[in-house]
Amino acid sequence: MASLTKKLVNGKPYYYLRECKRVNGKPKIVRTVYLGSAESIEERLLRPKAEEISMREFGGSVAAYSIAETLDVVATVDRHVPKRGHQGPSVGQYLLLAALNRCVAPTSKSQIGAWYKKSVLARLLPLTANQLTSQRFWDNMERVSSDQIAAIEQELAHTAVTRFGLELNCLLFDATNFFTFLDSFNNRAKLPQRGHAKQGHDNLRLLGLAVLATTDGDVPLMHHTYAGNQHDSVMFHSVVDQLFARCRALSEEVDQITLVFDKGNNSEVNLDLVEQGPLHFVGSLVPTQHEDLMAIQREQMRRLDRSQLPAVWAYRTEKKVFGRNRTVLVTFNQQLFNAQRKTLNREINKRKRKLEKLQDKLQRTRPEDRGKKPTVDGVEKNVKEILRGRHMKDLFSAQVIKTQEGLPRLRFQFREDEYQKLKSTFMGKTILFTDHGPDWTDEQIVLAYRAQHHVEADFRRLKDPRYLSFRPTFHWTDQKLRVHAFYCVLALMILNLLRRKLAQSGIVLSVVEMMNQLTEINEVTLLYPAPQRSKKPVVQTQLSKMNDLQKKVASVLGLDRFLHN
């Protein structure tokens, strides 16, 4: 039972709530709660309701901010782009805020002020409304050159490697592009060009982005922006020296690093450059250029370790590739085969239905019918359009003939022999090549190439509108597009390091799941009237109610240290 107890301290009474229980037959005080003086108890009991309650987003902002603190983002940027004068925010503060906005709630520069006011960053990075205009951001972005971006990123990457202990034994290089809304007549920007858009929108100008990332946490260590109409192999040739320099700057054992890249980067010149560099490599080859290798059947292959690579077989050999003898691995993946067969069958059935519909329509056409009659040329163009797509022209034989009345008729046949040939040669197979010899097993080669999914996941994150989104860009010059790309990749580094930190503590979440949980944690501030004999109002700050997962995440990240006292 609890009871109220008075205790005199220096002649003044103070009150405690004490709970007493019998322990081994004897009364014992098991809990004591200090209540204070009679005046303070009265004040709390009679305190009016809060005059003002405010709430700011807390979890996502401070979690990303804590990683940025560890990376020393502001100081690093400011070392390379010194502040002008002594007043106002530095370039480092502007770029950090832009990156944190990308982490938490991607928006345009004109909307960043409204987001900022609702975030706890308004307390951690205090700025005025006048300092958060689009023009102030653009003015500070204007000061950052391409060389400075590269130097800043290299220093941040080195900090990430050393302070977070990133593994560098296998690094991944890949490229993608993003569509922009730059006007066709904007001649100031040369980077955005029309090309093959990986998100569709071929009518829009594209900006290319290449990234070097770790397999350990998908952390980007370098990026490169390039013209949207530039082929990957041309881009790779222009950036390979930077790749080598970045790896040398990050590791003293650069000869132990294996670089993984896709077949789009292949060329004899590029492979010569890689051969002359310090890195090992694993890449892939275009299947249609090596039909002798694709003819190898699964029965000739060795089944790989089932615990690491279930349902994967491989045939290892040597072949002269791009002018040099290389270790070559032909792999067969049963899961890939099943998926490709399912997709191919769907496309085949779609073409069959279209050809049958066209055939039936032509069959019902009569000389006496009114209107414009179909022509052989027109039908052939229609058939050609129907059979667009990979393998379709090989799988169907189609012939347009003319009747005695001059009307076109369609005859077509599905080529079962070509279908079986396709299944036995191309489907489910991949050709890998590497400069590694007997020092690497088949399993190591396959697992290294498969690790490409890490950098592909990074690109998906940059194209997700919820967090990290590369869009909206709303920049119209190459220089500002480069700076925009820099802080987007910086945001990607921050959130991937954050996700990796949680995973190391047993909390495995995607970026979206992680940020959904974190951004629901709010800082709630309650403002009470000033008590008697005081002019200052009472301010109480606490976090909003958290679920079990949020409590665990907040504990691992130590978020309570950012709570306003």
Residue ranges and their predicted role:
Residues 1-93:
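Conserved glycine(s) in the ABC-transporter nucleotide-binding domain "signature"
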Residues 3-6, 12-16, 24-28, 78-565:
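Anion-binding and metal-coordination hotspots
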